[in-house]
Amino acid sequence: MLLTIIDKFIQIVLGYLLSDFIMGIYHWIKDTYFSPFTPIIGKTFIWGSRLHHVRPRYVLEFTDKDLIIDSAKWTLSWIGPLFFWFGLTPFLVTMFIMISLNDVIHKYTHEIDHERPMWATILQRIGFFQSHDEHHLHHIAPHEINYCPVTPYVNIWLEKINLWRKLESFVEYLTGVKPRAKEYEFVEDEKYPAGIRFLE
């Protein structure tokens, strides 16, 4: 009985931490490579990431419900087969929940205390959700640290081992592609979301 409880607890902790690492890799790729003008993925994935660096609080325009549904849909597309093969394990369920919540957790880091739900502020203060101060480090140009948006813990470990710079050096060695090779200029244009139009 005790061993079963310990096993489930370890699975939950690992799922919690791995979900943050997975989202960190995803955000690192979006922030480091490609552009808002890359065919197919530019408009669907990269554009929003670049816009967020220019207008960080634009994320507040989206409801919690919409953010959760959008994240849950794409998460289920790849974690669904794992549920089928391995069952609803505590590890996989925790990963699914935390990745589905990642955009909302990220949104809360851009809100001040009276804007976010009290329960979210409490979870930030007890170290379960990432806080504003922890996420703020990512928004210091050139946006090359603290890519993991969920927990207060994973970024610390990854920055200590300098993971992102090592990965970037490896990618450049293999492909010749430099990280953040071009920062795209923009102009204010009310016809575009958040009033920002990127210049190619």
Curated annotation (Swiss-Prot):
Name of this protein: Probable fatty acid desaturase MIMI_L630
Organism for this UniProt entry: Acanthamoeba polyphaga mimivirus
Compartmental location: Membrane
Gene Ontology CC terms, in alphabetical order: membrane
Family: Belongs to the fatty acid desaturase CarF family.
Transmembrane segments: 9-29, 79-99
Topological category with respect to the lipid bilayer: Multi-pass membrane protein
InterPro entries the UniProt entry points to: Fatty_acid_desaturase_CarF, Lipid_desat
Keywords of this entry: Membrane, Transmembrane, Transmembrane helix
